[in-house]
């Protein structure tokens, strides 16, 4: 057994670990919950993890309301859109912001692309109240971007 005094950071076994985060792409790669390393350990695909986070977000939003913002049937419909052709590149999307945007979009007008401002304000308020519970900080402009995304791509 070596003494602690004989261990130096410039020895080969330590040099390999220097700047390890730069080599693997950073401490937070992927969907914000440990990235690809955690994804492989969990056994979930990227689509499954996206759906889990989106569903958890809706559950937290519904818990903050007297009446559910999204019914079970509507939640199932939303989750079915994730890996469909209607939602391109879902891997690059924020699941929580998408879920909030979807809630606003389904109450909006898909023909005129007019956003339901009352529902948008409700979601903004819930987002601020539940901010510490979410997986990542969600900006109001991101929610608005996903509302537009859902309206333009007719995700309903």
Swiss-Prot record:
This is Uncharacterized protein 072L. It comes from the Viruses. It comes from Invertebrate iridescent virus 3.
């Amino acid at each position: 057994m070596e003494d602690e005094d004989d261990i130096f950071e410039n020895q080969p076994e330590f040099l390999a670990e220097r700047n390890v985060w730069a080599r693997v792409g950073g401490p937070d790669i992927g969907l914000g919950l440990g990235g690809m390393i955690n994804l492989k350990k969990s056994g979930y695909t990227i689509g499954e993890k996206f759906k889990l986070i989106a569903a958890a977000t809706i559950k937290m939003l519904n818990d903050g309301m007297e009446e559910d913002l999204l019914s079970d049937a509507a939640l199932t419909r939303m989750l079915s859109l994730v890996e469909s052709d209607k939602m391109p590149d879902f891997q690059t999307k924020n699941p929580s912001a998408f879920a909030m945007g979807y809630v606003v979009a389904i109450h909006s007008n898909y023909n005129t692309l007019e956003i339901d401002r009352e529902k948008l304000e409700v979601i903004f308020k819930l987002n601020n109240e539940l901010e510490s519970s979410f997986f990542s900080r969600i900006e109001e402009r991101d929610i608005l971007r996903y509302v537009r995304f859902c309206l333009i791509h007719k995700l309903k």
